Amino acid sequence: MSKNVVVIGTQWGDEGKGKIVDWLAESVQGVVRFQGGHNAGHTLWINGKKTILRLIPSGIMHPGVTCYIGNGVVLSPEALLKEIEELEAAGLDVRSRLQISEICPLILPYHVAVDKAREARKGESKIGTTGRGIGPAYEDKVARRALRVQDLFTPDIFDAKLDEVLDYHNFVLTQYLGAQAVSANEVRDQAMALAPAIKPMVRDVSSSIFLAQQQGARFLFEGAQGALLDVDHGTYPYVTSSNCVAGAASAGAGVGPQSLDYVLGITKAYTTRVGSGPFPTELLDEVGSRLATVGKEFGSVTGRPRRCGWFDGAALKRSVRLNGISGLCITKLDVLDGLEKLQLGVGYRVNGEFRDVLPYGAHAVAQAEPVLEELPGWSESTVGVTEYSKLPLNARRYLERVAEVCGVPIDLVSTGPDRNETIVLRHPLKG
């Protein structure tokens, strides 16, 4: 029986992690975000009502669960408070159940300005960021010039750090990117105005989790984006700016690796990608359009259409190795309903040689020609099915082949957006 579970996206994000974290949260006492920022969009459907969470962990929908934003997250005070107000307007108690690490790096207006100016300058060669300042905020962290949450409550320190970092960013904005400078006074005034609302939620999150675990509390560690967007292991440079793999939960939440008992990998029954970057199994035909339409494949944060393709088992195999995945959750199986034939990626041809795992780097992936295996589809509906035996025979065969190619058992199958539309083969927290 696992006490603590890490939930990771195994593809290029948008795998349906939010629903699964929300479903699992009823069995834990705490849910922790450990990387990313408000570029993540976790969509939950509960009793037919849609909720999108960007910063706040998906466990916030459960009254008895405490939610934590760990030090690995880059935090926009403005975005955080807006999200809190939206949830409170829906009747949720948020502030008494949310703890924010005092050492989270802040996202401030100059990060957004730099992010947008860079993408505009790159034109067609742009990475495809969300334009929310995530990358520049992580750059400041690594360059040791970041302002952090704790700095909001010591104005003298905040001012000194702000003047120094803004000298740098305004030079880049005006002299290199050809954009307007950002006003230090405006940044300072906005931050100081928001600080009092944030202060009651600020904690030493690492210690809070440690002490709760000593009392027997169970935790979910909620990943954002997906392993193939990891800044080290993804299709670099078409990646996000943080580590999205399971190992990042330890550093990004401030917990020891022995606290992580089980890794649940979330994957769609097909593959999607937002923005630029190589995508070996991408479909540019009617089938791809059908997957996008039926699957409602539009980004929950940006609204951008997602590119769609066949399930890529060789890419998933890379995620399995990177994350030490204990079991898989297959989402959006119902989107494949009605397709007469399916294709499943089992490897690639790279310079005439067969490879059974996604190569490293965007250039190498762009050269990879997918090796596809054809499987029969099914005409029956899988929407809302909650028992594995009631799935169509060919749907079960498809899932079995997915598990075989990836080398990991399937523990959960999602057959619809609502938390109850889930097939449980093995419960990650109950064995």
UniProtKB/Swiss-Prot annotation:
Protein name stated in the entry: Adenylosuccinate synthetase
Recorded GO CC terms: cytoplasm
GO-annotated molecular function: adenylosuccinate synthase activity; GTP binding; magnesium ion binding
Keywords: Cytoplasm, GTP-binding, Ligase, Magnesium, Metal-binding, Nucleotide-binding, Purine biosynthesis
Organism: Bordetella avium (strain 197N)
Known pathway: Purine metabolism; AMP biosynthesis via de novo pathway; AMP from IMP: step 1/2
EC number assigned by the record: 6.3.4.4
Binding site for substrate: S300, V301, T302, G303, R304, P305, R306
Subcellular location per the Swiss-Prot or TrEMBL entry: Cytoplasm
Gene encoding the protein: purA
InterPro entries to which the protein is assigned, alphabetical: Adenylosuccin_syn_GTP-bd, Adenylosuccin_syn_Lys_AS, Adenylosuccinate_synth_dom1, Adenylosuccinate_synth_dom2, Adenylosuccinate_synth_dom3, Adenylosuccinate_synthetase, P-loop_NTPase
Record flagged with keyword Ligase: yes
Highest taxon of the lineage: Bacteria
Class of this enzyme: ligase
Cofactor(s) essential for the protein: Mg(2+)
Positions of Mg(2+) binding: D14, G41
Cross-referenced PROSITE patterns: ADENYLOSUCCIN_SYN_1, ADENYLOSUCCIN_SYN_2
